[in-house]
């Protein structure tokens, strides 16, 4: 789960500014939720 979050963060940095950003934020939030679930 942690590697998935890190890779999604790196992908967000590579995406141009014109790309849909909300979708990336939603994916990162989903990864954070998964990390919290595994940590808990």
UniProtKB/Swiss-Prot annotation:
Enumerate the UniProt keywords alphabetically. Antibiotic, Antimicrobial, Fungicide, Lectin, Mannose-binding, Plant defense
Q: Give all residue intervals belonging to the Gnk2-homologous domain.
A: 3-40
For whether the record's keyword set contains Aminoacyl-tRNA synthetase, the answer is no
Q: Which domain of life is it from?
A: Eukaryota
Tissue specificity note: Expressed in seeds (at the protein level).
Function noted in UniProt? Possesses antifungal activity against B.cinerea, M.arachidicola, F.oxysporum, R.solani and C.comatus and moderate antibacterial activity against S.aureus, P.aeruginosa and E.coli. Inhibits HIV-1 reverse transcriptase and proliferation of murine splenocytes. Exerts antifungal activity through its carbohydrate-binding specificity.
The molecule here is called: Antifungal protein ginkbilobin-1
């Amino acid at each position: 789960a942690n590697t998935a979050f890190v890779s999604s963060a790196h992908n967000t940095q590579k995406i141009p500014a014109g790309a849909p950003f909300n979708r990336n934020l939603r994916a990162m939030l989903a990864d954070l939720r998964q990390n919290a679930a595994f940590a808990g």
